[in-house]
Amino acid sequence: MKKALMIASVLLIAVISTACINNIAVQELNNKAAEFMQKGDYESAMNRLQASLDLDSTLYETHYNLGVAAINAGKYEKAIEALENGLKLKPDYVEFYYSLGVAQAELADEIIDSDDSDDNEHKPTQEELDKVKSLRIASNENLSKYLEKGPSSKDKETIEELILENNKFIENDDNLVKVEK
């Protein structure tokens, strides 16, 4: 009985020690990522944040920061993935909705811009049109949720403009020509 208690105690201490070491490592990785973000080195920040999530994927803040870093790095699909994962952990964190809406709109723009060419003969495929439209619709849903949930949206006007721009694309998806403001 004493032996079993001793083994259980050693295992408990090992588990607690590992958890503490992981928490310290996660904190260090997140701090380093913040430094990289301040310097504009979003790729390095993303690497640190992903390593942090590999150690502890339960921190919604790390998912959010990874999403923001990915948006700034132009990695919109990665941003959407990170933000959706974080949103599952903390659906009442309103900033997820804003950043997710922005990432979705930016990815839609990227798909459209990749179709721009000098020969003007390239027509987007139906699959591309469908993806752009669904991204714009999802973007509007997330931006609208942000406005609903965000008690003091300082950037309300900017968000409403993005929603209007999304609507122009949704309504004109047959030609996908950017409508100038």
Where are the regions a protein language model picked out?
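Terminal, low-structured helical/coil segments at or just beyond the last alpha-helical repeat
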Residues: S117-K181
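Canonical positions in the second alpha-helix
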Residues: S52, N85-G86, Y146
